[in-house]
């Protein structure tokens, strides 16, 4: 008996009949957020430098990438109107759904209606809703790109969907290895995910390649989940082409948001669009599953949904042009600075998104085992946090976010250069190592 008259319970864990859900830990372990902020917590001040954390893909913190005044005013006006203080309908506010449909329609041969669109709390929630809606069959599997965006992996793990990977080919402008994709599929495959414009590779797929992807999906009898959040961050020569153009070949679920194009990821507004002119999603119950799942989840802010039509319709093209111009400058600057850091190689200059996807050559560095080791030591020595490629499914690659001010890009490469200079194996050592290997080969022969 405790002094306050309350009996102390045995503190051993087996007294209690509840415990945390281990599936959440398994899923969170593969997220970028877990990795990046874990590395952030391991930063030390030994370098005497401020922490550079250009990894979450959020350029909104920098002056050249602030969202436009028209978007800010749309949100303020929605809040002042008094018309957006209630709960929103589960599928989304009708005017927001209609505005997204009109925004996406463009050159689509079959136009979307408001009823084909569902509003979500950013694209990540859209991913969760779609993945969970496909996870009813315990033997089902999904095809994900390698490299790719790990939130798909995380949600598939949490939902119990088996993950199978297909490769993107650096020697072919990061096109999908369609033979490998077909080999990875079986009778339990339900969907493939395509990210276009591509995070992390920065490529934009051509019309011909997307047509081949659609034909392969039809052959396999699977849907295409097309992640198009970077559709407004294209600065190369290839135009962005929506996957929905090919929905008559295979049904397409398009995922998107205003986070990247309008540089406001904290606003959390995204969407799911059902490109399905043949009614396949209805006949297979996918539409019903998504609508049921929307009834289980919290709705996005009514204020943001009320503002969404004005955000999509009233943003001037000059806003996007300014942002694209800044990204082009940063890409050129980064590629120039990479010439002084030969352990990092960019196989293809990016055409979109806000990243450099770089191959890491550890043979040029002392005491660096792999990409994770590289990034961990970079944090410790330079207070610079980058994403190791293994987190995106590709060992010995590194992702650098360059969606930031030019001065920050310069500082990123100053620190990378300093790190490389300290760890670089001298050319003489490389020659000696090669000579030793040749001597071994000769002696064996």
From Swiss-Prot:
GO terms for molecular function: L-tyrosine-2-oxoglutarate transaminase activity; pyridoxal phosphate binding. GO terms for biological process: amino acid metabolic process; biosynthetic process; response to jasmonic acid; response to wounding. Its cofactor is pyridoxal 5'-phosphate. Expressed in roots, leaves and cauline leaves. Pfam families: Aminotran_1_2. CDD domains: AAT_like (cd00609). InterPro entries: Aminotransferase_I/II_large, PyrdxlP-dep_Trfase, PyrdxlP-dep_Trfase_major, PyrdxlP-dep_Trfase_small, TyrNic_aminoTrfase. Keywords: Aminotransferase, Pyridoxal phosphate, Transferase. It comes from the Eukaryota. SUPFAM superfamilies: PLP-dependent transferases (SSF53383). The keyword Transferase applies. Induction: By jasmonate and wounding. Its EC number is 2.6.1.-. Belongs to the class-I pyridoxal-phosphate-dependent aminotransferase family. Induction by wounding requires COI1. This is Probable aminotransferase TAT3. The gene is TAT3.
